[in-house]
């Protein structure tokens, strides 16, 4: 795999080519999530410049939230036609009154389409600015280590692998690439709405921080990388604790009571992630963990969650799904 012959050393195509070569095999198909915005337009162009055109396919999700949504889908289709890249599109209906909030509901709908239509390997255009925003957003929500790890460069969502080749790239470099190659893209008008949390962080909070700390974005993204390493270590520790306590699909209560409280909570979060269950609020998990450590044989602590329950009894802790 090689970048364009006209690319300078350590150019964006060179770095993306190296990223892809290190994580994929030559016969794997690459599906790019194409919104029509600058980031995904540049990502698709760079991948084509790397000589990967015959492996590429683009997938556009039509959310129907903007009066311009049809125009964006048409733009993406025409852009892919010019690049000689296969193009797929799918319409979704987003609940504007979702308890998740509009941003999160749209994201959930988008990723559901990705899971069904992207094949085995999906490439997304998140960049360093997105990483900094996500870290700030999660910190302000009181996230733990997993949340502050922010956006991973690679992760698996069931059978789907998700790669983000531009995650270490600054927004300014992406926009400069687009200008240098005379690329057009669409501007989502909602990106200027500071009533949306991420836009507020991008346009107001990070802008102010950058005025005082010019390296704020880079350093926040670097911190997210450190948190990611810490999260991986906690995962390894939880795996060891799981192996020491496992009894079929359950965990021995006697082994759990030998763990410190932070270590026990780490193990419970690890298991919930394995199952794809949402973790409870920190205070609820803390209280349940204390009950597991102190309850007598005649007590059966339980914690109800959206997907099921964690229930202690007969010397073990079990996870019981609903239905």
Where are these regions (language model features)?
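Alpha-helix boundary/capping and short turn/kink residues
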Residues: 141, 145, 210-214, 232, ...
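Mid-to-C-terminal catalytic subdomains of enzymes
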Residues: 175-225, 229-232, 300, 312-315, ...
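AMP-forming adenylation/ATP pyrophosphatase catalytic core
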Residues: 2-39, 55-59, 63, 92-96, ...
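Core alpha/beta nucleotide-donor-binding catalytic domains of modification enzymes
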Residues: 2-207
């Amino acid at each position: 795999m090689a970048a364009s012959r006209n690319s300078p050393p350590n150019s964006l195509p060179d770095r993306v080519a190296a990223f892809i070569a290190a994580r994929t095999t030559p016969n794997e198909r690459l599906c790019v999530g194409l919104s029509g915005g600058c980031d995904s337009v540049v990502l698709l162009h760079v991948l084509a410049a790397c000589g990967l055109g015959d492996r590429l396919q683009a997938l556009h999700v039509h959310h129907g939230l903007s009066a311009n949504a049809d125009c964006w889908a048409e733009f993406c289709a025409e852009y892919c036609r010019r690049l000689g890249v296969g193009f797929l599109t799918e319409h979704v209906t987003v609940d504007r009154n979702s308890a998740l909030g509009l941003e999160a509901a749209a994201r959930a709908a988008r990723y559901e389409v990705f899971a069904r239509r992207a094949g085995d390997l999906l490439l997304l255009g998140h960049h360093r600015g997105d990483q900094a925003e996500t870290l700030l957003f999660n910190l302000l929500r009181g996230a733990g280590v997993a949340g502050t790890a922010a956006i991973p460069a690679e992760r698996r969502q069931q059978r789907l692998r998700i790669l983000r080749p531009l995650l270490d790239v600054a927004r300014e470099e992406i926009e400069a690439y687009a200008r240098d190659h005379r690329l057009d893209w669409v501007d989502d008008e909602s990106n200027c709405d500071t009533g949306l949390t991420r836009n507020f962080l991008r346009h107001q909070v990070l802008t102010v921080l950058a005025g005082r700390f010019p390296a704020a974005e880079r350093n926040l993204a670097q911190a997210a990388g450190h948190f990611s390493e810490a999260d991986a270590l906690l995962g390894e520790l939880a795996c060891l604790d799981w192996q020491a306590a496992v009894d079929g699909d359950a965990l021995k209560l006697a082994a759990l009571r030998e763990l410190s409280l932070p270590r026990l909570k780490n193990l419970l979060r690890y298991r919930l992630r394995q199952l794809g269950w949402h973790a409870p609020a920190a205070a609820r998990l803390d209280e349940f963990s204390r009950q597991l450590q102190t309850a007598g044989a005649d007590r059966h602590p339980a914690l109800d969650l959206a997907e099921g329950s964690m229930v202690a009894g007969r010397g073990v802790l079990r996870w019981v799904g609903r239905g």
